[in-house]
């Protein structure tokens, strides 16, 4: 048995490996990028450090650790969970549509971010190779090649599942945060005046004295908080308490390191790659091990983000906002460990494309930030709407204040649009377009299918069944909901007289709870006709065959519908293409191939 202390520290260490990789690797590039925009004098450095500290307090600690993490569904968090909570509290259809669109936008921005984060993290770490003696003149193309090779190995590795190596992520990140803390402390001791930056008046003075230019610096300051949304999104994997406990340690490590980097800038105003230069000046002998540790930390950060993308896509599939895709479960005991091949390879291609396109990490910083601030702003709006409709109304002014600050950061980021920022919108527009076309297409398709109500269907069914030419055994027919009979079933049973001694309509409904499975077998809805209903949470992994066997249903054949869409509408043509390319219901639920019979129905849309 684990002692309480072991599970307490175990939870913290695990959180560091799975949640804090992204925000934990921000010190590699944040101040390096900001200092290209401002003078390295005491007034500017203290102002920027103060902005960084208070950004971490307001946008990560208050918005995510305190406000967002108080809103969970059975321990699950994230944009889709916020949408499910909010929709339950809304009454008008317009408000529901608005909440749905906000969720679509939030998910799309997060997925777009899933391309930029691995690219900037790995590239910025690899750029530290230039400080190794003899490699000072290493061409940028060589660095991109090294970064691309690391990315390729990282994405190929996904198929095996990260279960076995995930246990090493936590300890490596503990070493990383310890190194950041020690390095920062050593530097602060040399110039202790930087500690003044903890006072917010330095941030206010910086914004006041620098006007519009100071406001635009916020677009780079936000880099220190990228990955803050992971606290809430990954809540389902590890639980609220271990993540919040780990955040206190991570927060201290980050603040100490940023202050240390600030102290180093004051002593070395000409320094370029600040974190690497600081560590090299402190312990030149340990620079190469530190560089390897940095690369390991960025790989772990990218890994956590890839797992997060898989998780978001899976939630999107099961809540029907994304098309079905083939999902592999890579862990026998961790529900959250999944692999989606199509998403994995698309991400890899996009990451390498972005690396080649932007060349340097400071160029990539121009595209970074817009998606993050957009996600934070959307989270702020949704939280404010939720708190205003619950008993926690006292949190509304706080959530509103945070949302206004989010909006200020988002506005500051808009000036990045012409300098590469538009790429984060291009990347986000792809999943957004898929979600909008898919959800609207599904609704339009359902209307075009013209299903039959059960009572009308039973009139013909009973006559055919009574003739007695029934096939021995049990036939399963997948339907969307039991009282409604889809055209393919009418085609099979009524027109083709394919009728078994026992026929079972199977329907699967995903509930708005993350975890929960309820089954119900209704016998005798017609002669030799039963209905089997499964209500499952949207994060549940289902073994439908096992559930059927539990209720004594041993099928001989499984029928399912395939829609062949005929349309001249260009949008519905895109929908038809997505539908053809995506996995069908039976592939997604891993039903036995030898028993499957797909029945094609031609549908005009």
From Swiss-Prot:
It is a multi-pass membrane protein. InterPro entries: K+_transporter, K_trans_C, K_trans_N, Kup. It catalyses: K(+)(in) + H(+)(in) = K(+)(out) + H(+)(out). GO terms for cellular component: membrane; plasma membrane. The keyword Transmembrane applies. It is found in: Cell inner membrane. Keywords: Cell inner membrane, Cell membrane, Ion transport, Membrane, Potassium, Potassium transport, Symport, Transmembrane, Transmembrane helix, Transport. The chain crosses the membrane at residues 17-37, 45-65, 96-116, 139-159, 169-189, 211-231, 246-266, 286-306, 338-358, 367-387, 394-414, 417-437. Its main location: membrane. GO terms for biological process: potassium ion transport. One of its GO terms (molecular function) is potassium ion transmembrane transporter activity. Belongs to the HAK/KUP transporter (TC 2.A.72) family. Transport of potassium into the cell. Likely operates as a K(+):H(+) symporter. This is Probable potassium transport system protein Kup 2. The lineage of its organism: Bacteria, Pseudomonadati, Thermodesulfobacteriota, Desulfuromonadia, Geobacterales. The gene is kup2.
